[in-house]
C-alpha cells in the first residue's frame, strides 16, 4: 500500500481561487505525474482548471514536466507532425492520419504522434492497427523507420508512461481536459513544425501563444467549421501561423467545391481503414 500525498490539495485550492501560474502548474503536474495524487484529487484539479479556463501559462507549465518524463525519438530536423487535438466529438474519418501518408509520399518526413480513441470510435492508432501496421515502441526502430520510409508513428502511451496515472480519471470524467490540448504539443520527436487541428478558436489562440514560446513558429494551427479539428470543405475555416492573426477562409474561395458532409463520416477502425486505402 502506497500512502498518497496531500500535496495536490493546495494546487486544487489555487486553481479554485484562480491563482495558478506556470511554475505552480509545473509543481502540480509533477505531483500528478509521479503518482502522488489520488484519482479524486486529479479529477477535482482537472475539472476546476477546465471551468476556470486554461491559459498559455498552464499549458507551458504542464509541458515542462511532461517533456521531462517523455521517452524521445531522434527524427530528421525537417520532420513535421499532423496530430490534432481530437475531442471534437464529430467522429469523422482519420483525416490527419491519411494526410500523413500523402505528405510522407511527397518527400517530407512525418513524425506522427497519436493515440487510440478516447472520444471517438476510432483514433489514429486504431486505424493503423486495422491497416496491419504494427505499433513500435523502440525509439531506435522508429528512428530507422522514418529514415527509411519517411514516416513513423509514435504511439503516445509508449512515450508518455506517466500518463498511466491519469488515464482512468480521464475516461471516468469523460470531458475534455488540459490533456486534450497537451497531446499534440508533446511530440516525442520534438518537431519544430506541425500542422495542428484544434476544436475551437479559443484553443487556437492559446496554441498560437504556446508555439511562439516554444519557437515552433513554422507551424500552422487550423480549426474547421462546425467545431471540427480539421479544415472543413464546407464550412468557414480559421488558420493561424504563430505570431500572426487568425485568417478565415472557405474551401470554395480557393476553388474547391462543396462536398457532401456525410462523405467525411467515420465508423469503426475497419471502416476508416478501408476508406484510407
Regions found by a protein language model. Give the residues of each.
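Short glycine-rich loop/turn motifs that provide flexible caps or phosphate-binding loops at active sites
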Residues: 34, 52, 83-86, 113, ...
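Acidic, glycine/proline-rich low-complexity segments that act as flexible tails and inter-domain linkers
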Residues: 4-92, 106, 110, 258-262, ...
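Conserved catalytic-core motifs characterized by acidic clusters
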Residues: 81, 115-116, 187, 257
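A generic, well-ordered mixed alpha/beta core segment in the N-terminal half of proteins
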Residues: 84, 88-145
Amino acid at each position: 500500500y502506497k500512502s498518497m500525498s496531500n500535496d495536490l490539495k493546495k494546487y486544487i485550492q489555487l486553481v479554485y481561487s484562480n491563482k495558478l501560474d506556470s511554475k505552480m502548474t509545473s509543481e502540480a503536474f509533477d505531483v500528478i505525474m509521479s503518482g502522488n495524487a489520488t484519482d479524486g484529487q486529479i479529477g477535482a484539479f482537472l475539472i476546476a482548471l477546465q471551468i476556470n479556463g486554461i491559459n498559455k501559462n498552464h499549458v507551458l507549465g504542464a509541458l515542462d514536466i511532461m517533456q521531462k518524463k517523455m521517452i524521445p525519438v531522434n527524427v530528421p530536423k525537417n520532420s513535421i507532425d499532423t496530430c490534432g487535438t481530437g475531442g471534437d466529438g464529430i467522429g469523422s474519418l482519420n483525416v490527419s492520419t491519411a494526410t500523413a501518408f500523402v505528405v510522407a509520399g511527397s518527400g517530407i518526413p512525418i513524425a506522427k504522434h497519436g493515440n487510440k480513441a478516447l472520444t471517438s470510435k476510432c483514433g489514429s492508432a486504431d486505424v493503423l492497427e486495422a491497416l496491419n501496421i504494427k505499433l513500435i515502441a523502440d525509439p531506435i526502430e522508429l528512428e530507422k523507420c522514418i529514415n527509411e520510409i519517411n514516416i513513423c508513428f509514435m504511439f503516445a502511451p509508449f512515450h508518455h508512461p506517466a500518463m498511466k496515472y491519469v488515464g482512468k480519471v480521464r475516461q471516468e470524467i469523460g470531458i475534455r481536459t488540459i490533456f486534450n490540448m497537451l497531446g499534440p504539443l508533446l511530440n516525442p520527436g520534438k518537431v519544430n513544425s506541425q500542422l495542428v487541428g484544434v476544436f475551437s478558436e479559443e484553443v487556437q489562440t492559446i496554441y498560437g501563444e504556446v508555439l511562439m514560446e516554444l519557437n515552433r513558429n513554422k507551424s500552422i494551427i487550423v480549426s474547421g467549421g462546425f467545431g471540427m479539428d480539421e479544415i472543413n470543405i464546407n464550412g468557414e475555416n480559421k488558420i493561424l501561423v504563430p505570431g500572426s492573426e487568425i485568417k478565415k477562409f472557405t474551401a470554395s474561395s480557393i476553388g474547391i467545391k462543396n462536398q457532401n458532409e456525410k462523405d467525411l463520416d467515420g465508423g469503426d477502425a475497419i471502416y476508416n481503414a478501408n476508406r484510407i486505402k
